[in-house]
A protein has these predicted regions:
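Structured catalytic-domain cores with a bias toward divalent-metal coordination
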Residues: 1-278
Length: 278
């Protein structure tokens, strides 16, 4: 365990970004958890990875000459007070990269973090979407020209989603990691603010599976899914045309066909169905 970066405060305990290092040698894989204060699931998954990797290291199962770094959270201040964003200016840490060493606290934090982790061969970030919702666990990548969907398939999750970046995406960790020639992956599970054990175990297994397939650890695992690569531009929104109470009829990952009822919009006063979403 070691400190990656410290933010000093006059009125509260210093915020230390802690990293857990396993193995010695080439900077092979870095795993980053919660960047926002409500990403409890992401921090929990990293804690379970620390637990698993510590056990593997004690059993001599980290490959020689390979180093793995796990950072459970880079925004402990916001986690402690249950605020999504950082500091009095409500900065989004995952929209503050690459940062600089002379600006606002969020910029100094992201600059110091990226300086520390930019040389890793593989970068894995557990993050949350900018909109709330329910997800099938999947790997998401930026279409920067450096992305490698074949590597993303090695996580063994159901889907790999490739997104063409818009200007705001250039401030994310994933984009800036790729800009530093790190093979970067963002992993999404189906919860943020609370722990979902099923998808958390799936995420831990996916990362350990990836590390094994890249030759970083010795670990027995099942092969997982044959991932389906999806481009975000090929996805479609299904809008509701009426206001009211949304009642879903299916969940993320369910099989649906054209014409199937996916949800209802309920009148909030008399309970009648205003619209069926097909």
């Amino acid at each position: 365990e070691r400190d990656i970066y410290t933010i000093h405060s006059a009125y509260r305990e210093d915020m230390r970004i802690k990293g857990f290092q396993f193995g010695k040698g080439e900077k092979s894989a870095c795993i980053v958890g919660a960047a926002r204060g409500n990403e409890i699931q992401q921090m929990y998954i990293c804690s379970q990875l620390v637990k698993a990797l510590r056990e593997l290291e004690n059993n001599g199962c980290i490959s020689a000459g390979k180093q793995i770094l796990v950072i459970p959270t880079i925004n402990a201040y916001s986690v402690n007070i249950s605020r999504r964003f950082f500091g009095v200016k409500e900065a989004d840490i995952n929209r503050s990269f690459p940062g600089n060493d002379y600006g606002e606290p969020a910029d100094r934090l992201t600059n110091a973090l990226l300086t520390e982790i930019r040389d890793y061969v593989y970068g894995i970030q557990f993050t949350s979407f900018y909109r709330p919702g329910e997800f099938v666990p999947h790997v998401r990548m930026m279409e920067t020209g450096y992305q490698n969907t074949s590597l993303a398939n090695l996580f063994g999750l159901p889907y790999v989603v490739v997104r063409k970046p818009v200007p705001i995406d250039t401030k994310t960790l994933n984009y800036n990691w790729q800009d530093e020639m790190t093979a970067a992956f963002s992993v999404y599970t189906n919860q943020n603010t609370q722990i979902d054990e099923v998808s958390a175990r799936q995420a831990v297994a996916a990362v350990l599976r990836f590390l094994k397939r890249m030759g970083l650890i010795r670990y027995e695992s099942h092969s997982g899914y044959i991932s389906h690569v999806i481009y975000e531009k090929d996805l479609s929104d299904v809008p509701a045309n009426r206001a009211g109470i949304f009642r879903g009829k299916v969940h993320a990952g369910d099989d649906v066909r054209y014409g199937n009822e996916m949800a209802e919009i309920i009148d909030p006063y008399d309970g009648t169905v205003r619209e069926k979403i097909l």
